[in-house]
Amino acid sequence: MVFTIKEIAQLIGGHVVGDASINIHKLCKIQEAIPGSITFLANPSYEKYLYTTQASAVIINNSFQPERSVSPSLILVEDPYASFTKLLAHYYQAVLNKHKVGVEEPAHLGKHVKLGNLVYRGAFSYIGDYVTLEDKVQIYPHTYIGDHVSIGENTIIYSGVKIYAGCQIGKNCIIHAGAVVGSNGFGFAPQPTGSYEKIPQVGGVILEDNIEIGANTTIDRATLGNTLIKQGTKIDNLVQIAHNVEVGKDTVIAALTGIAGSTKIGNNCMLGGQVGVAGHTEMGDRTVVAGQAGVTKSYKKGNVTLMGMPAIERKKYLKNYAIFKQLQNILQIKKDEQ
């Protein structure tokens, strides 16, 4: 699609300095831009590229004063990063994520299924019995939707996703390729003989509205009750969420994190990559866990940053790490004193 600089400025609420009639057909990084493209400058360390970029337009802070003349037209805004994000979202919807409608055969549709308006079902998708798909749901090819699943309006289920029976998916959710929702929790009872007997997992999974689940992430069903992911939460690729976990609103969880069973995570928390969380622990609201940390106990008060293994509060961790880096010198001093 092609937009003029003027049209883009109107979309993001900016003011144009330069030629507003130029057509824009591509979004680029500032250092890789070409004629006919638009980019943005938010980080001062990239200012040098402003004077050499081939972009036709640059979104920039309205208080910015260039050191010398620039060739591209400028779109002045209050927050360049937020404005470019808005532009990306518009481009994504208009160009990359056009809503599909209808059925691609072959596709299986079970008994007593409730279909909303403008639903898309891709080839080789399987929809079980008593499923509800609300308006504008998109089910991409090679997807499995088990019996008694409900999926809210405008939700997108990408190829290869498996949603087991009885799970509830809210509105405006995105579940990326290969994710599994509702598989059995890891529950096994040790026996006197040394073997393990499987504990039936008869609960469900509830994903509230506006949730995004990354590729190949797994969310286990509860033993009893529900594994619950609350609205607005974003989960990266390759994350494991065990049975009966509760994740609060607007929390973000990075890739390769594993959260053990019956853990409760509050609202607005941030978990970095490769974090491990022990079962039956609790984190309060606005807890931040640094990458590769291992949380072994509860931090119910929230508003804390945790680092290390086992995870401790950031200030204490940094003090301990400073000492750790000096251990060799300290040992040498002790040897010299003997």
Swiss-Prot record:
Keywords noted in UniProt: Acyltransferase, Lipid A biosynthesis, Lipid biosynthesis, Lipid metabolism, Repeat, Transferase
Keyword Acyltransferase: yes
Signal peptide from the UniProt entry: none
GO cellular component: membrane
GO MF, one annotated term: N-acyltransferase activity
GO biological process: lipid A biosynthetic process
Residues the record marks as active site: 243
Enzyme Commission no: 2.3.1.191
Protein's pathway: Bacterial outer membrane biogenesis; LPS lipid A biosynthesis
Catalytic activity: a UDP-3-O-[(3R)-3-hydroxyacyl]-alpha-D-glucosamine + a (3R)-hydroxyacyl-[ACP] = a UDP-2-N,3-O-bis[(3R)-3-hydroxyacyl]-alpha-D-glucosamine + holo-[ACP] + H(+)
Class of enzymatic activity (EC top level): transferase
One Pfam assignment: Hexapep_2
Domain of life, per lineage: Bacteria
UniProt function note: Catalyzes the N-acylation of UDP-3-O-acylglucosamine using 3-hydroxyacyl-ACP as the acyl donor. Is involved in the biosynthesis of lipid A, a phosphorylated glycolipid that anchors the lipopolysaccharide to the outer membrane of the cell.
Family of the protein in this entry: Belongs to the transferase hexapeptide repeat family. LpxD subfamily.
Listed NCBIfam families: lipid_A_lpxD, PRK00892.1
Quaternary state and interactors: Homotrimer.
PANTHER family, alphabetized: UDP-3-O-ACYLGLUCOSAMINE N-ACYLTRANSFERASE, UDP-3-O-ACYLGLUCOSAMINE N-ACYLTRANSFERASE 1, MITOCHONDRIAL-RELATED
Name by which UniProt lists this protein: UDP-3-O-acylglucosamine N-acyltransferase
Natural source organism: Amoebophilus asiaticus (strain 5a2)
The organism's taxonomic lineage, starting at the top: Bacteria, Pseudomonadati, Bacteroidota, Cytophagia, Cytophagales
Gene name of the record: lpxD
